[in-house]
């Protein structure tokens, strides 16, 4: 007796999705007709040589490119199925929902506590007990609490580079985003600090949808579920990370991930 056919596994639901996205800086076309979905609660790595458009694409997701004179985007970016370019969408609120962690840690010249509390105060949270609870929770989620809990009043500038980067992640998490964008968050860190960031990413994806730009192929392979390869403004290939690194469909992808250029 034949067994009933098994239905194919459903594709992961996209939390964010770009459809035919192009980005220009003046006359320069930096990203060309990109369609890419970020599955919910997965890590998507964006890889490719310098200048290929991956950071431009990342910044487009929460409209950070709007802050660059002459930058303009065409196409669609959807967050939970709603266009981020709709007139009623407030860019500040969008950047709360879609947080960003930059390559270079940028702590404010304030105390550790105030670095994390700053965005909460700006958004209207004034109650001291509630602030303290949110700051602690954010530092715990960023795997930094145990290292700083006894010196929250000290300057954040006294932290190590790796600690400063985790503080910036805590600051992004404090305002309760749904998506976290990371632009080479470990490129300036030593191997031990890098390992802590990578371990943190593994834990964060249980709660957040994450996209990370990295030049480090080993890092992309370790932390991501899906990998997208960019080259000269084009999205060459996207797929499950293991497939991209072991059996890519495109020769350019294979040449890049095996170090033949980059």
From Swiss-Prot:
Any one GO molecular function term: ATP binding
Keywords from the UniProt entry: ATP-binding, Cell inner membrane, Cell membrane, Membrane, Nucleotide-binding, Phosphate transport, Translocase, Transport
Protein's membrane topology: Peripheral membrane protein
Full protein name: Phosphate import ATP-binding protein PstB
Domain ABC transporter per the UniProt entry, residue ranges: 16-257
GO biological process terms held by the UniProt record: phosphate ion transmembrane transport
Entry annotated with the keyword Transcription: no
Quaternary structure and partners: The complex is composed of two ATP-binding proteins (PstB), two transmembrane proteins (PstC and PstA) and a solute-binding protein (PstS).
GO cellular component assignments: plasma membrane
List of residues binding ATP: 48-55
Cited SUPFAM superfamilies: P-loop containing nucleoside triphosphate hydrolases
Functional note: Part of the ABC transporter complex PstSACB involved in phosphate import. Responsible for energy coupling to the transport system.
PANTHER family: ABC TRANSPORTER I FAMILY MEMBER 17
Pfam family of the protein (one): ABC_tran
Keyword Zinc: no
Taxonomic lineage from the root: Bacteria, Pseudomonadati, Myxococcota, Myxococcia, Myxococcales
EC number: 7.3.2.1
Reaction equation(s) it catalyzes: phosphate(out) + ATP + H2O = ADP + 2 phosphate(in) + H(+)
Xref: PROSITE patterns: ABC_TRANSPORTER_1, ABC_TRANSPORTER_2, PSTB
Main location: membrane
Subcellular location: Cell inner membrane
Family indicated by similarity: Belongs to the ABC transporter superfamily. Phosphate importer (TC 3.A.1.7) family.
InterPro entries reported in the protein's UniProt record: AAA+_ATPase, ABC_transporter-like_ATP-bd, ABC_transporter-like_CS, P-loop_NTPase, PstB-like
